[in-house]
Regions:
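Acidic/polar loop patches that form or flank catalytic/metal-binding clefts of enzymes
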Residues: 88-93, 133-139
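C-terminal beta-strand-rich structural cap/linker in extracellular carbohydrate-active enzymes
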Residues: 199-216
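Aromatic/acidic polysaccharide-binding cleft in carbohydrate-active enzymes
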Residues: 50-116
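Active-site-proximal helices and loops of the catalytic beta/alpha 8
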Residues: 1-49, 71, 98-128, 133, ...
Length: 216
């Protein structure tokens, strides 16, 4: 309704709820695809969606993200919110610390910032969004199979001469991945370790709740 009424962005609640179920092991990673297809018919073309792992409702009433995406579970889903098509990411109050409690919904509830444990993580993602046109809302999105799609979710974003590859392990177990798409083989920049690397067709492992992002 909001998108059809002229709003530029909407909350993709169905996607958030699917993310929660995947984090709990209740649904496979490819459950995200069903929501993507649903949203293509739910919203007008190119509707921007505000992806999130926590917001004021979910934090206060349902203990997001410290309860719904606890500890290392948070990271791959946060990467997803920052790199999906038609997305504008939401970082809720205190997530960069992180503040591991429910913030009062109606009353003043000051937060204390000391460690900023996720500062570099979020800064890396936000800088990537700022500099790379492949993460524009209208950049292309393509699923890529690099492993067991019940637990591995991988995709590319591309616009003009820029391309990004995202690989997410949405499970509590180490997984084996292998890149077979010839368009993804070769020199790439690892966004998180800031090193140039050569991606090849060899099998390798990705840690539980692991995430990899590459620029081409």
């Amino acid at each position: 309704y909001l998108a059809k009424s002229g709003f530029d962005a909407v909350y993709p609640w169905h996607m958030f709820k699917m993310m929660e179920k995947i984090a709990k092991g209740e649904r496979p990673a490819f459950g995200l695809d069903s929501i993507n297809k649903e949203n293509e018919t739910r919203y007008p073309k190119n509707t921007i969606q505000m992806y999130f792992t926590s917001n004021h409702d979910e934090n206060s009433w349902n203990h997001a993200d410290f309860g719904t995406f606890p500890n290392e579970v948070h990271a791959p889903f946060a990467v997803f919110t920052q790199t999906m098509k038609n997305s504008v990411p939401l970082i809720y109050s205190g997530q960069e610390e992180p503040v591991l409690r429910a913030i009062k919904f109606f009353d003043k509830d000051p937060m204390e910032f000391k460690n900023l444990q996720r500062e570099n993580f979020y800064k890396t993602l936000l800088n990537l969004r700022k500099r790379n046109i492949a993460l524009s809302a209208n950049a292309s999105f393509k699923k890529v199979q690099v492993g067991d799609e019940k637990v591995i979710y991988a995709y590319t974003r591309e616009k003009e001469n820029k391309k990004i590859l995202v690989i997410l392990n949405l499970s509590e177990n180490e997984q084996v991945i292998k890149i077979t798409d010839k368009n993804l083989i070769g020199k790439a920049h690892n966004v998180f370790n800031e090193k140039e690397t050569i991606l090849d067709t060899k099998e390798r492992k990705i840690k539980p709740w692991g995430y990899e992002v590459y620029e081409y």
